[in-house]
Amino acid sequence: MRALWVLGLCCVLLTFGSVRADDEVDVDGTVEEDLGKSREGSRTDDEVVQREEEAIQLDGLNASQIRELREKSEKFAFQAEVNRMMKLIINSLYKNKEIFLRELISNASDALDKIRLISLTDENALAGNEELTVKIKCDKEKNLLHVTDTGVGMTREELVKNLGTIAKSGTSEFLNKMTEAQEDGQSTSELIGQFGVGFYSAFLVADKVIVTSKHNNDTQHIWESDSNEFSVIADPRGNTLGRGTTITLVLKEEASDYLELDTIKNLVKKYSQFINFPIYVWSSKTETVEEPMEEEEAAKEEKEDSDDEAAVEEEEEEKKPKTKKVEKTVWDWELMNDIKPIWQRPSKEVEDDEYKAFYKSFSKESDDPMAYIHFTAEGEVTFKSILFVPTSAPRGLFDEYGSKKSDYIKLYVRRVFITDDFHDMMPKYLNFVKGVVDSDDLPLNVSRETLQQHKLLKVIRKKLVRKTLDMIKKIADEKYNDTFWKEFGTNIKLGVIEDHSNRTRLAKLLRFQSSHHPSDITSLDQYVERMKEKQDKIYFMAGSSRKEAESSPFVERLLKKGYEVIYLTEPVDEYCIQALPEFDGKRFQNVAKEGVKFDESEKTKESREAIEKEFEPLLNWMKDKALKDKIEKAVVSQRLTESPCALVASQYGWSGNMERIMKAQAYQTGKDISTNYYASQKKTFEINPRHPLIKDMLRRVKEDEDDKTVSDLAVVLFETATLRSGYLLPDTKAYGDRIERMLRLSLNIDPDAKVEEEPEEEPEETTEDTTEDTEQDDEEEMDAGTDDEEQETVKKSTAEKDEL
């Protein structure tokens, strides 16, 4: 008996020692545990344990192997731009940390898009793993969050390049945009996705990030970083992923909320429910399952059954094992985004909130769209599409206008994402429109370049433009004028210039300021409705500002007679109107050019002709003598009421506003426009016969055509009219000299009187030297005074001694 007791005690001690040894091998909860096996399987039955083996984990490395792995890994320093980027992201988005999951899922979706596109032309692309999924797993015990995709994966070089460096130009642009957004008080969380730096948002919640990736053209590698530096090494376990990428986050202490299943599920539904690939979360649920009974329970139940059914035939079939119902926690992958692609559903079945959520998901914007349209196009090509107008213009909308691709239309063929890199899915002027296009009629297994030349794309583009213009037209007037026109008005004007086939439709969307209202903008339809009887032209005046346009001498009589004038205040406005010959049967008239005429009675006509005859000497003198080289002709004006004169361009010449624009453009490109046909056109000099200056000039010319004062006055009037008409003076010094001469005459000062010369003065000593000399003199005087006092004291002392 004693021997048995001793033997039992030894067994207990051996068992305890074995447990302690296992505990010592186990690794503390550090990043190294990320490379160990998950313990989730211990919570499930055998069948679930098998499913658990599919869970996202980095298998099979013990503590010594992990240490050896880290010692052999190649260390890298982050590029300086990446360090700046990460610091800016962490500092600016620390209050919105949850967006890290959105960015990681978005990157995973991009990787899946790439491998699916490759598989269209390479049948072996999916051989490593035919699944196209995103899987997320929380590991509370180890404080780890895993995000795995079966996308294209990354080679070793791509891990170093994509996760350790970034284009310098892209960094600068991103930093500038972040700064601008912060200064404007706008959200910065959308920028990181737009600039492709969303991966670094992982450091908002993680102390360390581990990326395991397998590309079809390389072995599996592990990338690891603590945000200060990173390392890369070949995975000693070999190919455990098949293909794709696992991102493992070692979460910060304050980020433990992101290990809660409900938190992760809510974030996936909030940000990523419209991702085009299934997203799974490793989740638990309680199920009622059948379990075999213990032998005693089964025997007891069998006895009860035999009491109830005593007469049972002996040839009864073989007895089935007894089971009981038990509630059990089961772990499995739960699908988070089981929603059909929104554009594939009938528009009547889609709620407004769903459109808004989809827009935010695919465009990475935080604001709701201003407008959207969901339609199915049929005919030569069938496709489904949803198009959106954003609330605000994308940053840098007109940077290198026309030379940069538009990323805002995503093309799908049979629900397979093809590209967002087409240059002409939309015309340049609609480069702000965002949306998706999905067609079953386009070929799948061709290159992007071949697809871009496909004739059906031109048909799709044509229908997209028509639907976009319909969508814009339906935006409510108040919202259109206050929001859309401020953000995208220039795009519509460029459309009038560039899109000949849709020019009439676009013209109805134009808005301008006018003399009808001091601040509100007006459409051309509204202008035509307000036109005066017998008015056959739409009058417009171009200027650098509304104030300049409405104070121009060209609009004086028009406004006095009650005609409405459109004010063109943007550089592109005059180009736009020039490209639009008419609207609703009414031609446009630039009031700064020839051709402005008013309906006049017979009496008015006779009066005008009499005035023209009266001023004929002055007109001829100006044309043939005083302004011979400066003007084409001089005429009596019908458009001036207050100003003495104006300089009017010919129908084919440049107005003052257009000439300024052309000179500015020429200055930027280094061209000389002085020889340009339009720039070389001479202008017409119009005079106001009722103005006192003009009347007095007529009198003086009749008296003496060679009067130099009158000649100077004519030139000064011409140059003043040049400025008031919006043109630039070629010689401003000569203009200033003439003004000075006219002022001398008006003040009865001799025109040849010279300016008095300033008398020459002897150079004075500087204040600093004088001050220093004064200070030195004072010091010397003080020293001298001190010496005298000392001598007198000595003499006194000697005299006193003599007396004693």
Curated annotation (Swiss-Prot):
Ranges of Basic and acidic residues composition bias in the record: 792-804
Compositional bias ranges of the Acidic residues kind: 289-317, 757-791
E.C. number(s) listed in UniProt: 3.6.4.-
Modified how: Phosphorylated by CK2. N-glycosylated cotranslationally at Asn-217 by STT3A-containing OST-A complex: this glycosylation is constitutive. In response to various stress, 5 additional facultative sites (Asn-62, Asn-107, Asn-445, Asn-481 and Asn-502) can be glycosylated post-translationally by STT3B-containing OST-B complex, leading to a hyperglycosylated form that is degraded by the ER-associated degradation (ERAD) pathway. In normal conditions, the OST-A complex together with CCDC134 prevent glycosylation at facultative sites during protein folding, thereby preventing hyperglycosylation.
GO cellular component: endoplasmic reticulum; melanosome; perinuclear region of cytoplasm; sarcoplasmic reticulum lumen
Residues involved in ATP binding: 107, 149, 162, 199
PROSITE patterns the UniProt entry points to: ER_TARGET, HSP90
Signal peptide coordinates: 1-21
Domain of life: Eukaryota
Tissue: Detected in heart muscle (at protein level).
Residues modified by glycosylation: 62, 107, 217, 445, 481, 502
InterPro entries the record matches: HATPase_C_sf (IPR036890), Heat_shock_protein_90_CS (IPR019805), HSP90_C (IPR037196), Hsp90_fam (IPR001404), Hsp90_N (IPR020575), Ribosomal_Su5_D2-typ_SF (IPR020568)
SMART domains with a match to the protein in the record: HATPase_c
Gene Ontology biological process terms from the UniProt entry: ERAD pathway; protein folding
Reaction catalysed by this enzyme: ATP + H2O = ADP + phosphate + H(+)
Modified residues (Phosphothreonine): 288, 766, 770, 774, 786
Extent of motif Prevents secretion from ER: 801-804
Short motif (SRT pseudosubstrate motif): ranges: 42-44
N6-succinyllysine: residues carrying this PTM: 404, 633
Keyword Signal: yes
Family matches, as PANTHER family: HEAT SHOCK PROTEIN 90 FAMILY MEMBER (PTHR11528)
Function: ATP-dependent chaperone involved in the processing of proteins in the endoplasmic reticulum, regulating their transport. Together with MESD, acts as a modulator of the Wnt pathway by promoting the folding of LRP6, a coreceptor of the canonical Wnt pathway. When associated with CNPY3, required for proper folding of Toll-like receptors. Promotes folding and trafficking of TLR4 to the cell surface.
Domain remarks: The SRT pseudosubstrate motif associates with STT3A during translation in normal conditions, preventing glycosylation of facultative sites until HSP90B1 folding is completed.
NCBIfam families associated with the record: PRK05218.1
Similarity field: Belongs to the heat shock protein 90 family.
Protein name per the record: Endoplasmin
